[in-house]
Swiss-Prot record:
<feature type="active site" description="N6-AMP-lysine intermediate">
    <location>
        <position position="111"/>
    </location>
</feature>
<dbReference type="GO" id="GO:0046872">
    <property type="term" value="F:metal ion binding"/>
</dbReference>
<feature type="binding site">
    <location>
        <position position="171"/>
    </location>
    <ligand>
        <name>NAD(+)</name>
    </ligand>
</feature>
<dbReference type="Pfam" id="PF03120">
    <property type="entry name" value="DNA_ligase_OB"/>
</dbReference>
<dbReference type="InterPro" id="IPR013840">
    <property type="entry name" value="DNAligase_N"/>
</dbReference>
<dbReference type="Pfam" id="PF12826">
    <property type="entry name" value="HHH_2"/>
</dbReference>
<dbReference type="Pfam" id="PF01653">
    <property type="entry name" value="DNA_ligase_aden"/>
</dbReference>
<feature type="binding site">
    <location>
        <position position="406"/>
    </location>
    <ligand>
        <name>Zn(2+)</name>
    </ligand>
</feature>
<feature type="binding site">
    <location>
        <begin position="29"/>
        <end position="33"/>
    </location>
    <ligand>
        <name>NAD(+)</name>
    </ligand>
</feature>
<dbReference type="InterPro" id="IPR003583">
    <property type="entry name" value="Hlx-hairpin-Hlx_DNA-bd_motif"/>
</dbReference>
<dbReference type="GO" id="GO:0003911">
    <property type="term" value="F:DNA ligase (NAD+) activity"/>
</dbReference>
<dbReference type="Pfam" id="PF22745">
    <property type="entry name" value="Nlig-Ia"/>
</dbReference>
<dbReference type="GO" id="GO:0005829">
    <property type="term" value="C:cytosol"/>
</dbReference>
<keyword id="KW-0460">Magnesium</keyword>
<keyword id="KW-0436">Ligase</keyword>
<keyword id="KW-0479">Metal-binding</keyword>
<dbReference type="Pfam" id="PF00533">
    <property type="entry name" value="BRCT"/>
</dbReference>
Amino acid sequence: MIEQMRQLIQLIAKHNHAYYVMDQPTISDSEYDHLFHQLKALEEQYPELVQADSPTTKVGGQALSKFESVTHVVPMLSLGNVFNQEDLFAFARRVEERLPNQKVQYEVELKLDGLAISLWYENGVLVRGVTRGDGETGEDITQNVKTIRNLPKVLHSEKYEIPRLLEVRGEVLMPKSGFEKLNADQEAKGEKTFANPRNAAAGSLRQLDPNIAAARPLAFYAYGIAQCEPNHGLTTMHDSLQWLTELGFQIAERQYLCNSIQEVQQRYEQIQQERPNLQVEIDGMVVKVDDLKQQQQLGFLSREPRWATAYKFPAQAALTTVEQIDWQVGRTGTLTPVARLNPVFVGGVTVSNVTLHNIGEIHRLDVRIGDTVSVYRTGDVIPKVEKVWPEFRPAEAEVVHLPESCPVCASPVVMPEGEALARCSGGLYCAAQRIEAIRHFVSRKAMDIEGLGDRWVESLLRLDLLKDVADIYHLHEHRETLLGIEKMGEKSVQNLIDAIEASKKTTLARFIYALGIRGVGETTARMLANTFQTLEALKAANVEALKKTPDVGDITAEWIADFFLAPHNIEVLDRLIAAGIHWDAPTAPTRQPLNGESWVLTGTLEQMTRDQATQMLQALGARVSGSVSSKTKCVVAGEKAGSKLEKAAKLGIPVMNETDFLSLMAGYGQTLS
């Protein structure tokens, strides 16, 4: 146990140094809180093992030598945390038990996510600015704080006498708008950008050259008074903040005086909703006993006041463990790894599953089954694994490998070189791809089965009548079942059966396109049909033969070959042909007049549709492209043609209007049908 405690102490010390001294946080606040509370729980369970250097009795790290060290007369302690309503009410019970028979009011403020500093004024003149440092000793950053525009260098008030000595505590931060502009400027200059506004504020404030700080959009928000001589005579926290505004200080844009802890909870929910619209970053709210005498009665623990706590928003990041990594198969056959997590509450929801996207991301993170990971979520953003903690990795942690076969249908998994995504090769057979495969197969440009829409498909899948696309051609055997589907009468069923029967007569190009082979669109399907002439020849083609086909590159050739190598796909193909799908036998190939030419259609066509123009061009051997290049043979331009027309003129590509195009097509025997 002591070894685990030492490990946590060292880890927290490392992150304390990064946060408090270097101003370069390496983990989120919630991740730090998790480590801190883990250590605190162990110390409460084993008090005899508490170490002298435990961070539970301190605030942060040591000051850097590049700034003069300053000892705080009144230590700058940190706050305890609560994370939910139950914790908040427990805080209130502890407060009220120590203040029996007293009315307690609570001052609620925004918990600003900035850099805590202390400001010293003598006779109203700013004489020193000091960072919190480790709570006992900070760094003198006076020259830099004097450059902050909204921070008063000399105090003025028409209502109050300026005290001889005043120590004000507050946060230096960078408003969101200023942060965005700073990062844009940094990027334009080719310099490093900042990860978040807090890092930007801290980095700016601790520059040795005050001119750099002066150029940064920093702001100071006061949140309390550490010392005042003579005493200001104020009795509440709320009045103290208003007094500071009279002296020229800016305070956070929302403060609430609450008469009960229930009202505090209501304000918490309100602030949480308003958070995205605030001009500054916050990570919760601060709840303080308002009465200053009651604060004195309550006193302090070793590192935090008993009279105040930070009520944190749901963590945007949290630590948990990876219990398992499963592979899901999407509608297009993509294999996606999903981490099954020990459930953790983060960003307002309980997260138990997180996508890892692909095998490359698994390798980049080096995430293994059994690892401790940071899960990040903010707003409506999908949760993600942001970091792996190798220092917590158990000896039995399992390395994750890409599966060789599909977890759904056992077809081979393929991942062409240079591709980030692995896919199941069982396109026609795989149950995970069934809906997408059927939807594509019946579409107008494929088998064109009119009436077999999504509603029909979903009903047929529920009834287990469609396991793959070949089952479509056996639906007539289940007529009575079809008639039992809601809103499917005799006429609808007969129309569907007739449309399925009519689709059996097709073309080889349409059939190839209908198979849904990755990378094979209409044009590629037509090129394959023209090149190989028969389905058997296409099935037997190797990668090298496929690569010789116009419009087929190296990767597409591999996808086609993999498709026809999968036994399950061949089984479905055989059933489709056995069901009666057929096309005219190929005739002796003749050279087409526009063979291999690239044409482009642009603008609004009025005498024909784009599909009609495309079909006529393809029938003559041309390829229709979406962009103009030096290889373009001709551009057909309709009304309101734009950039493509301009590019054609620049490259000297011939341009033809609709009327001339239709005349040319008629000369080749192609007319609008």
